[in-house]
Amino acid sequence: MSERIIKWGFIGCGEVTKYKSGPAFQKIENSEVVAVMSRNGDKAKTYAKERGIPKWYDDAQELIDDEEVNAVYIATPPSSHATYAIMSMKAGKPVYIEKPMAVTYEECCRINAFPKKRVFHVCCVLPPLFCLLPKGKVTGR
């Protein structure tokens, strides 16, 4: 039985995907980055070439519609998170969203309401806050 491979499409080619979360996607077992998107096509092309990613786009809908992409990572400015998340879910793709999930409560509600119409996985990146606490300061409250 073959394992299912998550074939990621990144929407956003900034610092987060270059140095923080992005590199991990290519190191995790059964995870592969197959496409990236930036509104600046030259930036997307360079990013893809430097990292051995086979496809690049300058239009989010084209990346979302790519049949090889089976999950979408959204690492854009927060003002576009809700739009890209809903576009991805409409295409039937699970979504992993950088924090914050959206910029308003209403946008968060729109994202959360969508999965009720279908079965979806929506996940937002959250820092492990316990790591930020000084050692020995956890009181159990």
Task: Please tell me what each predicted stretch does.
Residues 51-114:
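Beta-loop-alpha module in the N-terminal Rossmann-like domain of NAD(P)-dependent dehydrogenases
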Residues 1-51:
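N-terminal Rossmann-like dinucleotide-binding module
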Residues 21-23, 45-49, 84-87, 109, ...:
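Short amphipathic alpha-helical segments
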Residues 17, 57, 97, 122-124:
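Hydrophobic residues in well-ordered beta-strands that form the structural core
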Residues 28-30, 91, 117-120:
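Short helix-capping segments at alpha-helix termini
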Residues 102-141:
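A contiguous active-site-proximal alpha/beta segment in oxidoreductase catalytic domains
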Residues 7, 32, 68-71, 94, ...:
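Structural signature of beta-strand start/N-cap positions in the alpha/beta core
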